[in-house]
Amino acid sequence: MSETRKDTDRASAQLPTKCQLPERVAVIGAGPVGCLAALAFAQRGCKVDIFESRPDPRTHEAITRASQRSINLALSTRGITGLRSVSLAGLGVGTNAPNGMDLADLVLQNSVPMRARMIHVVTRQASATQAAEVKEISQLYSTKGESINSVDRGRLNNILLEHALMHRNVEVHFEHKLQSVDFDHDIKSAAKRAGTPPPAIDASANKWLRGANVTGGDSCADEPSGCGGRKQATTKSQGSEYVAPAGTSAVDRVRLDFDVHSTNQHIRKTSNTHYASFVVGCDGAHSSIRSAMGSLIRMHYTHNYIDTGYIELSIPPRTSLGSGSRIRGSGGVDGKRGGHDAFHLDANHLHIWPRHSFMLIALPNLDGSFTCTLFAPFKMFASELSTKEGIVAVFQQHFPDALALIDEEKLVKCLTTRRASALGSVQCDPYHYKDRAVLIGDAAHAMLPFYGQGLNCGFEDVRVMFDIIDQHESLQVALDLYTKERHPDLVAILQLAEQNYREMAHSVVSWPYLLRKKLDGLLMSILPSSMWSSLYAMTTFSNLPYSRVVKTEKRQQAIIGHALVATAVAFVSAAAVGVYSTRALWQPVTVRCIARLHNS
């Protein structure tokens, strides 16, 4: 199923670029990163087709299904900057919509700012005579009042998808499951016509794709013909449709074959072939595009899982009034003091219940609800959390305040009927194949969700890639440079995401962590950010490359280490000087005591 909906009253502004961009781009996966990339290409004059294996995510069924498995997203500086690098559909960068809002503003309007963490610590267990007691500890994210923004993934995706559909250069194809891709189709076709063998290319490049599981989300739009408006020869046989090229063309460089869901009750699916000049792989951690590239080039690739899974839960609103209800308390959705009757918990906090090997988190939504995620080892889901009695016992002991808000019956139903989802990370290198394909988003660097940087990093991919593309005439030179410059940053954020899981589950209540946090806050209040900034602030509230963030943090740790050693040496030296200078007082007493002990 394809969809094209254009705003005919809005003229499409083309952004300036030095690069000779491809005529037709295929974006595989219609998720947030894919939609943003599609808009960026479309605004530079490219015809874009977005291909998505799943149905339209804007339907009620799709929204309900996504709410059961998707972790809320935390949008911060890198993601906001990435959104602002791509203008609204039909408008140039730096040009606001009539109401003065840009794409980032539209997304932020549908988010809830979180200025701090709220740590929930059980200080007294429940007993027969008294209720459990939970202490809440607020930890500000920034000394400058900066916030991260909780946004529903489906809502964000639909905003970007709507704006992609508004652009006249974009077409979206839903329920198109990629089956095979030939990145060198034009080379092979030309060699076949000339009667000469094509250059040596691994013949297995496409075979692996048959029946592959595609989980991606971004794709790019095309003319209704799917072939750039050129003449085509179409043949149909046994439910398959093949659009044959009418001669060698720049848009014939890459061939993509899809299985397409059919509404015909006699034919469950049909086959469809599309051609493109360039492919953007935004098809998630199990990327088919990445696997196809890996069979053609020497790609370094790892996919690691951790022994922790997650299940989504929900805290409903206090009332049905939603985010527009009467202000109360100390936490409003506008980031200022004041709250709303709809929220059971402070709305401007990311709530964490750290319990070492497992934890619960809750992020606010505009309607007053909280999206909760329980992270725990798989063996815990299979044992303590597999029965009603076990679930209630775990929550009464570790999350008594959350249990009262979630509702015991709904909690038990969620944990006994839903399967825990896996968590893992992907690392690969390079991110491109010649000037024909590139990987961005989770397809290039899926990461653990504990730093809240997955989406932000994906949006930053788009910004960084086009910053480089716009400065170079050759697309291949630009992509070579993108891989070279981006790889150290992506390795760094993958490591930071793994480290932050340990911090959230263990360290947030430890005295070394709290001491370092206070020291960072003190130094940041008296020194400029160029001289001192916390690791979290550099990662979340700046666009500093991730690799430089890690180097800066190591330097700051070294400074603190040297300062502690110097302080210890100074203390010992001062004590030694004090002892020596007062020897006239303690030396006679010491001599007499030793003499008495000796005589006895």
UniProtKB/Swiss-Prot annotation:
Can you name one GO molecular function term for this protein? FAD binding
The protein here is known as Kynurenine 3-monooxygenase
Native species:
Mycosarcoma maydis (Corn smut fungus)
Q: Does the keyword Protein biosynthesis apply?
A: no
Reported cofactor(s): FAD
Q: What does this protein do?
A: Catalyzes the hydroxylation of L-kynurenine (L-Kyn) to form 3-hydroxy-L-kynurenine (L-3OHKyn). Required for synthesis of quinolinic acid.
Q: Extract the InterPro entries matched here.
A: FAD-bd, FAD/NAD-bd_sf, FAD/NAD-binding_dom, Kynurenine_monooxygenase
Which reactions are catalysed by this chain? L-kynurenine + NADPH + O2 + H(+) = 3-hydroxy-L-kynurenine + NADP(+) + H2O
A Pfam family for this UniProt protein?
Answer: FAD_binding_3
Top-level taxon: Eukaryota
**UniProt family annotation:** Belongs to the aromatic-ring hydroxylase family. KMO subfamily.
Q: Which UniProt keywords apply?
A: FAD, Flavoprotein, Membrane, Mitochondrion, Mitochondrion outer membrane, Monooxygenase, NADP, Oxidoreductase, Pyridine nucleotide biosynthesis
| Cell inner membrane is among the record's keywords | no
Please state where this protein is localized: Mitochondrion outer membrane
Q: Which residues form a coiled coil?
A: none
- Region (Disordered), start-end ranges: 217-242
GO BP: 'de novo' NAD biosynthetic process from L-tryptophan; anthranilate metabolic process; kynurenine metabolic process; L-tryptophan catabolic process; quinolinate biosynthetic process
Please tell me one Gene Ontology term that the record gives under cellular component.
Answer: mitochondrial outer membrane
Q: What is its EC number?
A: 1.14.13.9
Its pathway, per UniProt, is: Cofactor biosynthesis; NAD(+) biosynthesis; quinolinate from L-kynurenine: step 1/3
**Family annotation (SUPFAM superfamilies):** FAD/NAD(P)-binding domain
